[in-house]
């Protein structure tokens, strides 16, 4: 049986130091819901686990004058129960409530879900739709990048050696914005997303769309906003026909990027329907 060094970090600086011992291959752990499964499947590929779950800065949800801040070790359950997130990011709360089982939501963290970079990760579409920024700390200092540029391909995050994801930030969306997260899985509970959509938007005084964001999950090699679909919607009056056109465009864009494969016939129809439903929920119109 492989022996592992397991240490607890008391601060971000402590964690970075513990992760950067030249003679050891180190890995951070918080909830472990993905990492422990991977260890059981393939065996550990590191010598040391650095537990960061108790670092105060990684567990906070707060609002500053400029932005919302969510620590990377915040669990799905804590995020879902946050009054602040229920107010400013209901699409993220919906996504957190859809994750796995209560046991997984109580242990799994937003940061771990993003760093694992699974295309089906439930937190990625809402964070991308929120235009969230990821904050990282490492031996060379701190840096930031959009969440959409952190998880760039299936199970590959653009972390530099010895870096730690510390928190996410995003600005409040414009007043009057509504949002939603819709997930399609094999069953209602403990389901891995086959497809999902996070959407946010509002209409202005003239009754036309003046703000919209749309990010599908498990549809593309990595989660990103569909800017062409957003452009189609901006300046238009919400209607079932508009939502249908947006859904059709989303399906075409998905196929253009991924090509046709055995699952395309199903996903083409499914992503179109999810986009229509999400836009109807955001803009308050019946998609049928």
Model-found features: residue ranges?
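C-terminal structural segment of proteins
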Residues: 1-288
